[in-house]
Amino acid sequence: HQYYLRVFTEQDVIGHMEELAAGAGGGEQPKERDELTRVRVAVAFADLAGYTRLTEELGDARAVDTVERFVASIASSLPSEARVTKTIGDEAMIVSPDIPALVRWAVSFQAQEIEPSARIGLHCGQALFYEGDYYGREVNLASRVAARAAAGEVVVTGTVAELKPPGVSFD
């Protein structure tokens, strides 16, 4: 039975791959560039500082619980127009059309001094929006900015610093 199941599965997968290669995958074709939407957004990445050490100290299951609480605290504190678009491990990607509002959120989130500490990086620009997610150079830059943040820090690009809300200053 195992042999036939493996052979059937392989044939089924190969058949689907051939259909997709021939362009017959249920009528869905890859999106043309002009079907993608460019939108001006602020993109933030927030992750837990010292997550590797945390998993070693607490174990995987408790570390996952910590990540779930972290992401829930992000989602519950976001301005109404912002949202968590995805999580990757201990990192959350947050997007908002309101750049000053996302800056205010990042600063206030870090002021909470949660443990373990977060690192947040922000950038803004024209990103590609496709099927509920954001892509492109601006998103990649936001991710790299977050990687430069230390525990408890918010690091922004020059573009974001120029658009910061009144009352917020950056060193």
Identify the meaning behind each predicted range:
Residues 18, 22, 69-72, 163:
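Residue-level signal for alpha-helical context at structural boundaries
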Residues 93-171:
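Catalytic beta-strand-to-alpha-helix segment of the class III nucleotidyl cyclase homology domain
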Residues 31-105:
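Catalytic NTP-binding/metal-coordinating core of nucleotidyl cyclase/transferase enzymes
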Residues 8, 12, 60, 69-70, ...:
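Bulky hydrophobic/aromatic packing residues
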Residues 7-8, 55, 138:
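Generic alpha-helical secondary structure signal
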Residues 27-29, 34-37, 70, 78, ...:
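Residue-level detector of functional hotspots within protein domains
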Residues 1-38, 65:
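Regulatory cytosolic signal-relay segments
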